């Protein structure tokens, strides 16, 4: 058994360093997270669908469970990639459905639409947003700690979890609901423009709201209300788009498929 003096010394060092042990544990978590992507039996599919359901109807409950996860596994981030994997699968199916609907039927065109939706809209933009959120929260929003307290920090993988959680309701609204409303949304009318733009403001406002809940669940962060500020900008843009008669669904379809509706 190690001497008491050594244990206390080591404990003090970790306390002064703040995140020494957590950083080491986090470095081990990243390879494990990606390794489990290729091991379906290790994924908790039932729990993932539970999260997806409550993200749409009671997202605050999801982050209460996140707090319990911290207590049991001593990390905020999920160690199970099932959520991201299932969401990528859903997005691939949805983007393929759009490609078929708009007669983008060649194999390369379908792959192009799927690639753009999954690897640009979700993954690349998500990595960027998660990194910005991770940097901003650790740099500006952490609560000052006392000299003998452990200095906690936001895990990058948790920031990416927040993006995944926030993106799922947006996916439901702007990929699924919008798809079934296309006959209405693509009509040349003011009602179609208002309905389309309303879907977009609801989807992106919900994204920022769930993002706020994710960071607000961390007890060592303060002023997390800043993640709600973009919603005000969205409402201003919404009013401008309605006044101008801009239909965002038409604009997005034109961008993705390269033709004018």
From Swiss-Prot:
Lipid bilayer topology: Multi-pass membrane protein
Superkingdom to which the source organism belongs: Eukaryota
Main location, first listed in the record: membrane
CC terms in the record's Gene Ontology section: Golgi membrane
Entry keywords, A to Z: Membrane, Transmembrane, Transmembrane helix
Annotated TM spans: 37-57, 82-102, 113-133, 166-186, 190-210, 225-245
Location in or out of the cell: Membrane
Family membership noted in the UniProt record: Belongs to the unc-50 family.
Protein name (Swiss-Prot/TrEMBL): Protein unc-50 homolog
